């Protein structure tokens, strides 16, 4: 094993996560219908600041992400600073790494604190699947540019005459990978077939996720990290995630038909994450600064790693590539972990990654390692449920996972937690968290 990489400042101070918060997550076109991601981001950052009673002027930087970006607000981070009463001198920039976006935001802040250029910062992400950038066809887009350049009526007429009715139809955001034309669901189907992940196993994992998430809410474990969201038209506030099946029945999952391969497929709406709206954020600072301000850290960032793999085959296998790196950089093994939280984009993808964690063949042929990182103890795995139940606002999921894991580690008296996720484009992330 290589030497661990210590994530500390030059003075040896660790990077502390002082607080984390999120909105409830809402299924597309439900409680947050019509509320753009930037407004959800403002909500969560405003509430985070209010709960920590931290002077906004002390915050040096805000790094925020959004995957489904709106053209009118391309830098969501800066709009949040300007729209929440924070100091206008607070630096802000936006990041995007698909489903790993808020992990990237946290990693960037961590590195800035380590470098000494930032003392206190907020990282997070927000996405709305209910407010989408509906575009126009390429032919119409070109015609609109040409119309702006046209010098006379005849030129304008000639441009418009070339358009057909189909060119005027609105174009929704693409659901397929730009490089391959394949959707995430199609990749999940491929992984299910390639790694022999049965429909029964997928449905069982989804049922487990919903059951554990419902129990977490019933036990009050999430109340301190999710706030009641009041959004226009202010008729009915959302207090908790509305995708969770409160009384999940395993038998009911078998009734749904496959979505992406209707003949031989196993991926259904029930064993895949739904389109979701929501926002999440975490407050980070060097541990010495937290002590100066009288703030008790939730925990610390021990290590992180990102990975990139081929997009044509097993595109969602990122956790299996990033996790060995993160564990190595933390100087630990899989057995040292108290908790493991893997993003459940699809049950098939999750189960395939768990299989590869334990595969000596995968370790040898794909990772160039002499042994597998190990079989996951399911008593440590996604103990409060996962994205299949909570939903997945793309840019917010990482911050949700970090906050949730740190709180659960504290309830268990401390330890080490792993967060890991796949992301579009063959990307992956793993992050090790520590609670004393």
Swiss-Prot record:
Annotated compartments? Cytoplasm
Which residues fall in a coiled-coil region? none
Q: Which domain of life is it from?
A: Bacteria
Q: Which UniProt keywords are present, listed alphabetically?
A: Acyltransferase, Cytoplasm, Fatty acid metabolism, Lipid degradation, Lipid metabolism, Transferase
Q: Which Pfam families match?
A: Thiolase_C, Thiolase_N
Source species of the chain: Aeromonas salmonicida (strain A449)
Described by its record, this protein's role is as follows: Catalyzes the final step of fatty acid oxidation in which acetyl-CoA is released and the CoA ester of a fatty acid two carbons shorter is formed.
Q: What is its EC number?
A: 2.3.1.16
UniProt protein name: 3-ketoacyl-CoA thiolase
The record's top EC class is transferase
Q: Which CDD domains match?
A: thiolase
The record's annotation in PROSITE patterns points to:
THIOLASE_1 (PS00098), THIOLASE_2 (PS00737)
User: What family is this protein classified in?
Assistant: Belongs to the thiolase-like superfamily. Thiolase family.
Tell me the Gene Ontology biological-process terms attached to this UniProt entry: fatty acid beta-oxidation
Query: Does the record carry Lipid metabolism as a key word?
Result: yes
Q: How does the record describe its quaternary structure?
A: Heterotetramer of two alpha chains (FadJ) and two beta chains (FadI).
Concerning InterPro entries, the annotation shows:
Ac-CoA_C-AcTrfase_FadI, Thiolase, Thiolase-like, Thiolase_acyl_enz_int_AS, Thiolase_C, Thiolase_CS, Thiolase_N
Quote the catalytic residue positions. 99 (acyl-thioester intermediate), 392 (proton acceptor), 422 (proton acceptor)
Q: Name one GO cellular component term.
A: cytosol
* Pathway(s) it belongs to: Lipid metabolism; fatty acid beta-oxidation
- Tell me the GO molecular function terms: acetyl-CoA C-acyltransferase activity
What reaction is this protein's catalytic activity?
A: an acyl-CoA + acetyl-CoA = a 3-oxoacyl-CoA + CoA
